[in-house]
Amino acid sequence: MPKVAVGGTFQYLHDGHARLIEKAFEIAGDGKVYIGLTSDEMLQKNHSIDNYENRRVRLLEYIDEMEIPKEKYEITRLNDPCGPTVEEDFDYIVVSPETYPVALKINRIREKKGKNPLEIVYVEYVMAEDGTPISSTRIAKGEIDRHGKMKRESQA
């Protein structure tokens, strides 16, 4: 049964996050998805980002809406970008263009430890209606909503 890793801060659960999470569950099939959620410590007290527990609750609510059985996933605290993927056995890692370099680093570390590389599943950015990627930063700035719909005219 496949063991799939996906990770992020998940400040605002937007359509890009949804695509990553959905892809992870699709690949896992009868296996299990391990969702690494960035710890407060790793964020180095970035006050614009909600605390770990609030982000975890929102993530749990989102997965519950997907009607995924609790035994099919586990949310783990990420205290570093690689999390448990360098030590534990995983089959896949699902990444965005932003996190792809971390997956390459993980595989280099795994190789040095004599472990099999993870199969990297690359998921493209989800674009907002203006043709640029949906991101939590853009949502926080009030440019777009979680689905990429423009909220106001950008300042030129």
From Swiss-Prot:
This protein's pathway: Cofactor biosynthesis; coenzyme A biosynthesis
The keyword Zinc-finger is assigned to this record: no
Gene: coaD
Catalytic activity line of the entry: (R)-4'-phosphopantetheine + ATP + H(+) = 3'-dephospho-CoA + diphosphate
Protein name (Swiss-Prot/TrEMBL): Phosphopantetheine adenylyltransferase
Compartmental location: Cytoplasm
Signal peptide residue numbers: none
Enzyme superclass (EC): transferase
Keywords: ATP-binding, Coenzyme A biosynthesis, Cytoplasm, Nucleotide-binding, Nucleotidyltransferase, Transferase
Entry EC number(s): 2.7.7.3
Entry-linked InterPro entries: Cyt_trans-like, PPAT_arch, Rossmann-like_a/b/a_fold
Function text: Reversibly transfers an adenylyl group from ATP to 4'-phosphopantetheine, yielding dephospho-CoA (dPCoA) and pyrophosphate.
Protein family membership: Belongs to the eukaryotic CoaD family.
GO molecular function, one term: ATP binding
Pfam families: CTP_transf_like
Ranges annotated as spanning the membrane: none
GO cellular component, one term: cytoplasm
The keyword DNA-binding is annotated on this UniProt entry: no
Biological process annotations from GO: coenzyme A biosynthetic process
Cross-referenced NCBIfam families: cyt_tran_rel, PRK00777.1
Highest taxon above the source species: Archaea
